[in-house]
């Protein structure tokens, strides 16, 4: 039952990654098309544009959601591959614990960075 639930979250995280990377690709790589319909705002990789996006709450939420989904998806996938090596139960538990702790620590650090970017005072390039 536990593995089925984890697998469900693994698939759900893949869907979240797919949607959020679609938004990223649209924002970063389809600027000309978006500008032609009035959504784009110039060159998306200029430092002023990057900083402007990082100051917006919606982008912070998007970054944190993508971070969480990518960390879970990647670390659960890594854990699943390692558990297929037919290791001892103790080692399997240790691998699961290391992946979980690494995921939580990386999520906390990444979320902290995203929040600090929103709270940064505006910098003029």
Positions of predicted regions on the chain:
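Membrane-embedded alpha-helical bundles that constitute the cytochrome b-like, heme-associated redox core
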Residues: 1-125
